[in-house]
């Protein structure tokens, strides 16, 4: 599975856009595109989806799963 940062950067380069041009077209700040391409993890999902919409994709949060403790001493 491709990392989000690699996917966005590769697709942006395929359409021959600078980060600034791409950000303007996607309707997000330049810093959003930079953070995504740098692999930052503290991103706003709505902003990420504005970027992914440029390629016909969307991201959704994954369900959180709690693991049971196997520690018998507790």
Regions found by a protein language model. Give the residues of each.
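DNA major-groove recognition helix of helix-turn-helix/homeodomain DNA-binding modules
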Residues: 46-62
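A short, Lys/Arg-rich alpha-helix, primarily the initiator
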Residues: 1-14
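Short alpha-helical DNA-recognition segment
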Residues: 16-34
């Amino acid at each position: 599975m491709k990392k989000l940062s690699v996917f966005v950067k590769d697709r942006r380069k395929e359409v021959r856009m600078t980060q600034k041009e791409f950000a303007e077209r996607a309707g997000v700040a330049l810093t959003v595109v930079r953070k995504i391409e740098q692999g930052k993890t503290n991103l706003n999902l709505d902003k990420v989806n504005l970027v992914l919409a440029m390629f016909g994709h969307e991201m959704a949060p994954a369900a959180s799963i709690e693991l049971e403790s196997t520690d018998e001493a507790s």
